[in-house]
Amino acid sequence: MAEKGKRRCSFCGRTEDQVALLMTGMTGYICNECVEHAHDILREEALLPKNDFEMKELPKPKEIKAFLDEYVIGQDKAKCALAVSVYNHYKRLMQRDSADEVEIEKSNIIMVGSTGTGKTLLARTIAKLLKVPFTIVDATVLTEAGYVGEDIESILTRLLQVADYNVEEAERGIVFIDEIDKIARKSDNPSITRDVSGEGVQQGLLKLLEGSVVNVPPQGGRKHPDQKMIPVNTKHILFICGGAFDGIEKKIAQRLNTHVVGYNSVQNRMHIDKGDMMQYIMPQDLRSFGLIPEIIGRLPILTSLRPLDRATLRSILTEPKNSIIKQYVKLMEMDGVKLTFNDDVLEYIVDTAVEYKLGARGLRSIVESIMMEKMFEIPSSGVDSCEITKEYAQKQVEKSTVIKCTV
């Protein structure tokens, strides 16, 4: 029995000669073993899933769309679908600790639209608003395990890296899988031969999309037996898939039994422009294109993006908060130079993008080709202003590879 008068831990009661270290506080003592035990408890608590989103903090669908409007021009239908889906997804995260009998299912999203219509930008902007880890994955580099290419698990490795290997943060992040149409199987019928970069990848994606614990190699690359794995639960990760699905208009037209302008068809019951066909897209069209039914079922929210017309491209050039024109004005401003673009230059940029079907992404390429020489020369020139004329813009674009590569 411990002698009276000896100092003892206020928590476990052990005396100072029974422990390695006894620390003194204002009104009591604590031993090293109790400190270690308290540290373990705190660490376990920190690893427990937390509802980081409170209802009062979570942006409402209208607020999400308003934020998207600041960065993305047009595509109101896709914005509304995305806003509602994201809002419901993060409400679902708030429900996960409750004992509610009604379990809200995941609302993964698939966006269909031609290149340059804003699929990636929409997903990136959503992640920016919610301040959650976000990563973009190109589906074309994915292959089944054991084949040359990237494993499906590499998707989660990238998300972990963005989250600085904070598993809890990664488990509430957003993954954008681009070019999902490129892993479609070649026909609507199941393949009798192994398709390691098509149907095989779709099968591999299923466990990620539906929600399961996946062992992820910490530094990426292939798995090997002696490697330490990081378990990541994908149940609360929001997956947004995007693809151009070139030629799917034919599938839609066949289903609707209509005539599409630009395609030969016997039926001529109603004329719908090719650009409007996407609004009629249904899950069965994705299946006809080559996505397996299981994948389609795990991407319940289907929305389409319209091709960008000239007026929309003109707005994209100058109106968003981070428009390419505003970015170059800011870059020049940092060098003490006032940059101006004549109105006919802006019209020329848009006309070039429309003529060569470059989309919104092409606007940046054109502006960069116009500005490259100026950005090289002006910082050393000592001038305080720079005006871009149409003649100068035409000369620079004609010299660049932007047009040459599209001819």
For each predicted feature, which ranges?
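AAA+ P-loop NTPase nucleotide-binding core of proteostasis motors
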Residues: A2-T24, G28-C34, H39-T135, A139-V148, ...
